[in-house]
Amino acid sequence: MAENRRNDREQSEFEERVVSINRVTKVVKGGRRLRFAALVVVGDRNGRVGFGTGKAQEVPEAIRKAIEAAKKNLITVPMVGATLPHEALGVFGGGKILLKPAVEGAGVAAGGAVRAVLELAGVADVTSKSLGSNTPINVVRATVDGLTQLKRAEEVAALRGKSVSDFA
């Protein structure tokens, strides 16, 4: 009973977005085996976001597995208001994503998989450019890589042993 309540609370805490569903085949002696691979992004629109992949013979089961994997793979995104603290370049495989902070009210200028990650992270004002590969999994991983590189001014000041006012 308590397990169900915890799962219900988790359900309401995170929003999920299916980025891609891919039909994959494995050739065996008797023919082809069909499976589905799902890529899902989850986030609370408050600075926490994660992604996961799942594979199964049915689409709903693949999505469920991907959601579980995404919830185990959450990162926290440092934000300044509704935008990013500074520019970042995320790289994964052939995918490169350039993330730039934008002025308040600019909105999310990003496409496809990048938009899903940024919106579910709660970033409201950002500009992005996808360079290189446009494969959804590489784009999502590169975006998450870019978000993990972000640091607040306070963190940088502490690392350098200076005060925040020295950076102004």
UniProtKB/Swiss-Prot annotation:
UniProt keyword terms in alphabetical order: Ribonucleoprotein, Ribosomal protein, RNA-binding, rRNA-binding
Gene Ontology cellular component annotations, sorted alphabetically: small ribosomal subunit
Listed PROSITE patterns: RIBOSOMAL_S5 (PS00585), S5_DSRBD (PS50881)
Record domain S5 DRBM: where: 14-77
UniProt keyword ATP-binding, yes or no: no
Keyword Ribosomal protein: yes
GO molecular function, one term: rRNA binding
Matching NCBIfam families: rpsE_bact
Function comment: With S4 and S12 plays an important role in translational accuracy. Located at the back of the 30S subunit body where it stabilizes the conformation of the head with respect to the body.
Similarity remark: Belongs to the universal ribosomal protein uS5 family.
Quaternary structure note: Part of the 30S ribosomal subunit. Contacts proteins S4 and S8.
Protein name in the entry: Small ribosomal subunit protein uS5
Source organism of the structure: Lactococcus lactis subsp. cremoris (strain SK11)
Gene that encodes it: rpsE
